């Protein structure tokens, strides 16, 4: 994937760059593998805003991604690499030998014509899925399950990967994308390889409107508000926040405060925090 840079013809194109979508299929979405999903736009079930910086954006159809690779011992062939507006990675359309078509997250270096399989004992090739207990140490994996049978949750964004560090009788030590080291059950499934589309993080939006197309609302600084709206607000001119540490709009510590519950049951599975 190559990043294409625009000429500075207008202020909006001065620093703008886009993926050139080379290798991405031009075909229309598959109706049987896509559906409309109501987007919450930062609201909860009562309609109250819980995320102030979400809303708007272009209409999207959600693609049915096979996070749970349950087509065991059946070979699949990659038909095409497609764009998915709902995620940073690309998706690969796979047709299995029984005729079923499904989408999976495209790993790095997975190209059209490659064959993949989900099995307990298979080769360590890009795109193959198997339990982490059968994956060699040091292997890069993605789409890793937190709990057996729940489908992949870990390392699904563009360029993300986890690494198998150590193995025990019932658990496997995993290096998370955040830098955290965590134990997961050895019966959890994972897919071999790193997620593709590494150039996603090199793209510069170039203008505020392009961010609005993605459904992101502007984020207003607290120091630009009034005292009644934010703890950082008020003051004469460009004044400091007037606090010993930055605070959220609701008066809680904004930076460095641990937010994980100290008695959460899964704390015992975290070997080292990020």
Swiss-Prot record:
Residues 230-252 are annotated as: Disordered. It comes from the Eukaryota. Belongs to the universal ribosomal protein uL2 family. It comes from Euglena longa (Euglenophycean alga). SMART domains: Ribosomal_L2, Ribosomal_L2_C. PROSITE patterns: RIBOSOMAL_L2. This is Large ribosomal subunit protein uL2c. SUPFAM superfamilies: Nucleic acid-binding proteins (SSF50249), Translation proteins SH3-like domain (SSF50104). PANTHER family: LARGE RIBOSOMAL SUBUNIT PROTEIN UL2M, RIBOSOMAL PROTEIN L2.
């Amino acid at each position: 994937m190559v990043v294409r840079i625009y000429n500075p013809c207008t202020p909006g194109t001065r620093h703008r760059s886009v993926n050139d979508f080379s290798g991405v299929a031009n075909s229309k979405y598959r109706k049987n593998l896509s559906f409309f999903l109501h987007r919450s736009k930062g609201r909860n079930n009562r309609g109250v805003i819980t995320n102030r910086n979400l809303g708007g954006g272009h209409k999207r159809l959600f693609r049915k991604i096979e996070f749970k690779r349950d087509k065991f011992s059946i070979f699949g062939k990659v038909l095409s690499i497609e764009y998915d507006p709902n995620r940073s990675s690309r998706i690969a359309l796979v047709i299995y030998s029984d005729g079923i078509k499904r989408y999976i997250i495209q790993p790095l270096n997975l190209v059209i014509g490659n064959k993949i399989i989900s099995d307990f004992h298979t080769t360590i090739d890009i795109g193959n899925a198997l339990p982490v207990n059968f994956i060699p140490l040091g292997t890069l994996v993605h789409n890793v399950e937190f709990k057996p049978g729940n489908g992949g949750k870990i390392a699904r964004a563009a360029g993300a990967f986890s690494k198998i560090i150590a193995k025990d009788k019932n658990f496997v030590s995993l290096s998370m994308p955040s830098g955290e080291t965590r134990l997961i059950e050895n019966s959890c499934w994972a897919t071999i390889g790193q997620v593709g589309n590494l150039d996603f993080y090199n793209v510069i939006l170039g203008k505020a409107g392009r961010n609005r197309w993605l459904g992101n609302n502007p984020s207003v600084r607290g120091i630009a508000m009034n005292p009644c709206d934010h703890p950082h607000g008020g003051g004469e001119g460009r004044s400091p926040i007037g606090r010993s540490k930055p605070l959220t709009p609701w008066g809680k510590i904004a930076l460095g405060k641990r937010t994980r519950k100290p008695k959460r049951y899964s704390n015992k599975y975290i070997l080292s925090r990020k």
